[in-house]
Each structure stands twice: as structure tokens, then as C-alpha cells.
From Swiss-Prot:
PROSITE patterns per UniProt: SPASE_II (PS00855)
Enzyme class: hydrolase
Transmembrane segments: 26-46, 57-77, 82-102, 111-131, 147-167
Membrane topology reported for the UniProt record: Multi-pass membrane protein
Organism for this UniProt entry: Cupriavidus taiwanensis (strain DSM 17343 / BCRC 17206 / CCUG 44338 / CIP 107171 / LMG 19424 / R1)
Xref: Pfam families: Peptidase_A8
InterPro entries the record matches: Peptidase_A8 (IPR001872)
Name this protein carries in UniProt: Lipoprotein signal peptidase
Disulfide bonds: none
Role this protein plays: This protein specifically catalyzes the removal of signal peptides from prolipoproteins.
Length: 176
């Protein structure tokens, strides 16, 4: 007796990815793009400016070349040198955690976009710490005589990514 089982009767393979999900490699490529943009602008500034030089662009914005041995707002900048490796190690650990998150949350596009920005920014600043021993900052916004601490493209990416994480979480909470 011939077998009555045909190929069409076999269950179809299921795709484990959620509808609308993307590959983590896409988000890693995006993070790499952030790193490349950050490093490109830092190289341009380092080649075009002397340390401490400031060039006005508008009435509230200068390009400037400054170094930051600490973290945001020069936190721990005068700590004696150990902070270079502390912040480098922290950036590597955060980067590894974000890569893990990207593989765990492929169906959450806004979340993946946000953490990719944070990853790119973290890696951009880690590159500076490893190569130069400090982070290169060059964006200087001010009002009158008050200057916001100088920052860079990597810092912008981290900030935008953090804001988008908050937006993503608020959207998720609102759905439930």
C-alpha cells in the first residue's frame, strides 16, 4: 500500500521572528555608521583646530576642540587616570549588553533603533579613550556667557537613544 502522506501535508516551518522584525545585523551596521560619523567629525576637528581653539558658527554655537578625560559633564575628569580604563571597560560592558538586547528584541524596531544609537555613541567614545586617552568634544552651545559643556556626535547619539528608549517604554506602557 502506498503512503498517503504527501509533502503538502507536512507542517510548514515556522519563522521564529516576530512580524515586522529586523535582523540584529542591520542594527549593528547602523551603530557602526554612528561610530564612523563620530570618528570622521572628530578627525576633521583635530586636523583643523588647535587644543582650546573656538570658532563661532552662530550667535549660540561654536566649534571648539577640547578633551574630556571623564564622563558626561567632565565627571571624574581629574580623578588621576584610572577613569580612562574604568569608562573604557564600562563602554565595552554596555556595548556587549546592547548587542545581547538587539538579538533578544528583534521585533521592537524603536527599541532596537534607540539602543543602536546608544551602542554607536558608546563605541565612538571608547575608541577615543583607547586611542587618545580622552574623549574629543567639539560642539559648544551657549547662551550669553553660559556655555553648555562641549560634546560630540557620540554624545548626541547616546542622548537621542536614551530619549527614544523613554518614548518606547511610554508607548509600551500606554498599550497595556
Amino acid at each position: 500500500m502506498a503512503s498517503t502522506t504527501s509533502r503538502s501535508a507536512r507542517p510548514a516551518r515556522r519563522n521564529n521572528k516576530a512580524a515586522g522584525s529586523t535582523t540584529p545585523l542591520l542594527w549593528l551596521a547602523f551603530a557602526l555608521l554612528v561610530v564612523l560619523l563620530d570618528q570622521f567629525f572628530k578627525i576633521v576637528i583635530v586636523r583643523s583646530f588647535t587644543y582650546g581653539e573656538s570658532r563661532p558658527v552662530t550667535g549660540f554655537f561654536n566649534l571648539v576642540l577640547v578633551y574630556n578625560k571623564g564622563a558626561a559633564f567632565s565627571f571624574l575628569a581629574d580623578a588621576g587616570g584610572w577613569q580612562r580604563w574604568f569608562f573604557t571597560g564600562l563602554g565595552v560592558v554596555v556595548g556587549a549588553f546592547i548587542v545581547w538586547l538587539l538579538y533578544r528584541h528583534t521585533g521592537q524596531r524603536l527599541f532596537c533603533f534607540a539602543v543602536s544609537l546608544i551602542l554607536g555613541g558608546a563605541v565612538g567614545n571608547v575608541v577615543d579613550r583607547v586611542i587618545y586617552g580622552h574623549v574629543i568634544d567639539f560642539l559648544d552651545f551657549y547662551v550669553g556667557r553660559y556655555h553648555w559643556p562641549a560634546f560630540n556626535v557620540a554624545d548626541c547619539a547616546i542622548t537621542v537613544g536614551a530619549v527614544l528608549l523613554i518614548v518606547d517604554e511610554l508607548r509600551r506602557v500606554r498599550k497595556h
